[in-house]
Swiss-Prot record:
Assembly description: Monomer.
Membrane-crossing segments per the record: none
Name of the molecule in the record: Methionine--tRNA ligase
Primary localization class, coarse: cytoplasm
Family listed: Belongs to the class-I aminoacyl-tRNA synthetase family. MetG type 1 subfamily.
Cofactor binding annotation: Binds 1 zinc ion per subunit.
Protein's organism: Roseiflexus castenholzii (strain DSM 13941 / HLO8)
Encoding gene per record: metG
GO biological process, alphabetically ordered: methionyl-tRNA aminoacylation
Pfam families: Anticodon_3, tRNA-synt_1g
Length: 592
């Protein structure tokens, strides 16, 4: 029976376009992982969507004098365009502004309330005297009490990741007008994390330390070490999921965004199932089996600033609800810097995805963001390094290997040649191919994407060396049988590398698949469909049918006699002049 895999990906606020840090931090790693499991033939569901209730959206709406829905309709389509351009293959990328999400969130709230894991309590809320209203946490900024960062948000510090309440900040102020905030009492519902703490601790102790990343465990253990306390799940807001209780005091309050956003993984799975015509299919990924075990392995791809929400709060909600599968792994990535400096949207020091997705081949961007990805430590986008690695690794190593082998074969044989007797050199490359296939498989199973990509590229280097030593371009003139054997071995290595690179480089892998004489698709791409939002206006989702790639993860069995198509280069060499051009673009737009 094939494995069942849930790939749950962080929900971005629909208040601005993606920069490359977002892509490297969650969306591209998730896509590589999902594509790999589909190639294995595993039942794979990859879901996410635009977080429509985040405070940044309401801030943008208030500043522009428009509605939150207007902000969402401006930026949600840009997400879909970027995902299509880069081949991010969601089974469903939706929104939290849907009837389905409101229904699932309401059910989660009521079940937790029924099971005794929610309670009411009066708390102190941030209040603007100048505006005469309560302020959401992210409408408040101040100095972080933990690290001293001067622009910490009311709920979390972007610098150190510390979670806190607005009243913990030093000199808190409103982001709307800069005025100091005061604090008033207001009643809200709380998630009883203290009551759930014993079960959470037992779960954390049960996870396999061999695959959870060290930083993910450290963040989680530090939270538990401090002890858990109740966390408010409602706020004095006008925009969001209504609080489903018959209490006039909560008529003008809404469910807090951090609570409803994580439910999105669950609600998106339900929406996907309904869209496929099998409304109960989501249960295959979520509902525990009769023995209490999970029906699937659930992987949550996020940035490190979201670790506590996915290793403490969301698991607590799942435990409190009952009979829903807990995360199997939370591969949280670190941050991607830009030219040695932390990206800053306020300073516009960022490399925005829409700015580069049309200027460079998608596989060049994908390659660099994985090869240089922030898996276990912060990494850095450098234009000089981007050009150097694309040219020396993607073009001169892998692209050159594929082009040389196909060109010589097509010119001299027109098809995959019939091999003769193998030599030790042939057998060594065949063995290296087998070993690399096994090691890349194991690394991808463990979500070690950088290492897996490096192993595949190392095999391409080995195959290039084999070609240089065997010189088939000379052999074709005086020893056709030996030339045929060398090219056959090289073609099968290239064919296997096509598969190994496919999760990382789907566009060029599909092209190579066709050049090698295959029909069909090994790298299906997503597409946009239209549905309807709760306000009756059109709503766009990203989806796709990826079944065509199932079972393609295997060592090459490329048969002799299969026609080879006239090859063209898979990748474009980059002119070094673009380094200065791109750096100039960055400096021209930065705000000091």
């Amino acid at each position: 029976m094939p494995d069942t895999i849930l790939v749950a990906v962080a929900w971005p606020y629909a208040n601005g376009p993606f920069h490359v840090g977002h892509i490297a931090g969650a969306y591209l790693p998730a896509d590589v992982f999902a594509r790999y499991h589909r190639l294995r033939g595993h039942r794979t569901l990859m879901v996410s969507g635009s977080d429509c209730h985040g405070t940044p959206i309401t801030i943008a709406a208030e500043r522009e004098g428009i509605t939150p829905q207007d902000v969402i309709r401006r930026y949600h389509p840009t997400f879909l365009k970027t995902f299509q351009a880069l081949g991010i293959s969601f089974d469903l990328f939706t929104q939290t502004y849907t009837d389905n999400h409101y229904r699932v969130t309401t059910d989660m709230f009521l079940r937790l309330l029924e099971n005794g894991y929610l309670y009411k309590e009066t708390m102190v809320g941030s209040y603007s005297e100048t505006l005469g209203r309560f302020l959401p946490d992210r409408f408040v900024e101040g100095t972080c009490p933990n690290c001293g960062y001067p622009r910490a948000r009311g709920d979390q510090c972007d610098s150190c990741g510390h979670l806190h309440d607005p009243q913990d900040l030093i000199a808190p102020r409103s982001v709307l007008d800069g005025a100091p905030v005061t604090f008033r009492e207001t009643e809200h519902f709380f998630l009883d994390l203290a009551k759930l703490e014993p079960q959470l601790r037992a779960w954390i102790e049960s996870v396999d330390r061999s695959y959870w990343r060290a930083n993910t465990l450290l963040f989680t253990q530090n939270w538990l070490r401090e002890g858990l306390r109740g966390r408010a799940i409602t706020r004095d807001l006008e925009w969001g999921v209504p609080v489903p209780v018959d209490d006039p005091a909560f008529k003008d309050k809404r469910i807090y965004v951090w609570f409803d956003a994580v439910i999105g993984y669950y609600s998106a799975s339900v929406e996907w199932a309904e869209r496929t015509g099998a409304p109960d299919a989501w249960k295959d990924w979520w509902v525990c089996l009769p023995d209490g075990s999970a029906p699937a392995r659930s992987y949550y791809f996020i940035g490190k600033d979201n670790i506590p929400f996915h290793t403490i709060i969301w698991p607590a909600m799942l435990i409190g609800y009952g009979n829903l599968a807990l995360p199997y792994d939370v591969p949280a990535n670190e941050f991607l810097n830009l030219e040695g400096d932390k990206m800053s949207t306020s300073r516009n020091w960022a490399l925005w995805a829409p700015e580069i997705e049309d200027r460079y081949q998608p596989d060049a961007i994908r390659y660099y963001l994985i090869a240089n990805g922030p898996e276990t430590r912060d990494s850095n986008w450098s234009w000089a390094d981007f050009v150097q690695r694309v040219n020396s690794e993607l073009v001169a190593t892998w692209g050159n290997l594929a082009n040389r082998v196909l060109s010589i074969t097509h010119r001299n044989f027109g098809a995959v040649p019939q091999p003769g007797e193998l030599t030790d050199a042939d057998r060594q490359l065949i063995a290296a191919t087998q070993q690399t296939f096994e090691s890349v498989t194991a690394l991808l199973d463990g979500v070690k994407l950088r290492a897996a990509l490096s192993e595949a590229m190392a095999l391409a280097q080995t195959a290039n060396q084999y070609l240089s030593e065997q010189e088939p371009w000379k052999l074709v003139r005086h020893d056709q049988e030996r030339a045929a054997t060398v090219l056959f071995v090289a073609l099968r290595t290239v064919d296997t590398l096509k598969v190994l690179f496919c999760p990382f480089l789907p566009f060029s892998s599909q092209r190579l698949h066709e050049l090698l004489g295959y029909t069909g698709t090994i790298a299906p791409q997503p597409h946009v469909e239209e549905t309807t939002a709760p306000d009756g206006l059109p709503r766009l989702v990203l989806t796709g049918d990826y079944r065509a790639s199932a079972g393609a993860w295997r060592i090459s069995v490329l048969p002799p006699g299969q026609p080879i198509q006239p090859p063209t280069p898979l990748f474009q060499k980059l002119d070094e002049a673009i380094i200065a051009e791109e750096l100039a673009r960055l400096r021209a737009k930065v705000r000091l």
